[in-house]
Amino acid sequence: MYDQVTLKLNVDPLILSALKEDITSEDVSTNSVMSHPQQGEVDLICKEDGIICGLQVFERVFTLLDENTKVEFFVKDGDEVKKGELMAKVHGDIRTLLCGERTALNYLQRMSGIATYTHSVAALLKGTKTKLLDTRKTTPNNRIFEKYSVRVGGGNNHRYNLSDGVMLKDNHIGAAGGVKKAVAMAKEYAPFVRKIEVEVENLDMVKEAVEAGADIIMLDNMSHEQMQEAMKIIDGKAEVEVSGNVTKENIARLTDLGVDFISSGALTHSAPILDISLKNLHAV
């Protein structure tokens, strides 16, 4: 759940932008059939099993349209929900309920889908020391929602933005003239409290990263045999992250290597939505 400062400064402007995108000048369909205020109620129903996430954002869509809208929740973020389950009732002006329906559901379906998919992957890491991380491969202007959803699903957030930590990827290394030079420059520039992570693609780069004193070494798109050799080279001198081609099918083999982190862009860019709907709208 977002605190009030985050909600007002960071979340509300994004929701308002989404509402402006959808409503523009008016909701011509609603205004065609509802010319006067009329109080109503509608049910929020889950249409498949999953992990619910984004209830605060769902509610905020309606209250930004009309502060008198009330939502009665029967579940909370992180709960496992079942197909057909009644999760909430929304009370308010029917025009508000109709105007906000699609935007509210878009957020809730997307966030719940990410939480559900993350939960299924995180379950495969239980009993191991390996932590599941997301990436910055998020939908533009939706990172605050998508990374929150990863946490609700049982994953962990990697960098939120470029200010959060030093990650030297292939192009940084190329621009600097090599792994050792890149790490040395980062150590000189970045505050000492910031860890320095280096992305490596082969065993020679692994050796350079270790010798340069990198705090975290990311093994990117390496074969299983290469990763086994890399772990021997690193030998506890740095934390190890694995990224690239991470699937539910191969994740057990990755944890067997003893890596500290597994990062997956799929948590945010490939998670399917959770099917949720607003049904049974009626006047009260």
What positions do the PLM features span?
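Acidic/glycine-rich phosphate/pyrophosphate-binding loops and surrounding catalytic core
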Residues: 2-212, 216, 228-233, 239-241, ...
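Short secondary-structure boundary segments
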Residues: 221, 244, 265-266
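Short acidic, glycine/proline-enriched helix-loop-strand junctions
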Residues: 236-239, 281-284
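Short glycine/threonine-rich catalytic loop with a Thr-x-Gly-x-Asp
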Residues: 241-243, 278
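Structured adenosyl-cofactor binding patch, chiefly the S-adenosyl-L-methionine
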Residues: 272-281
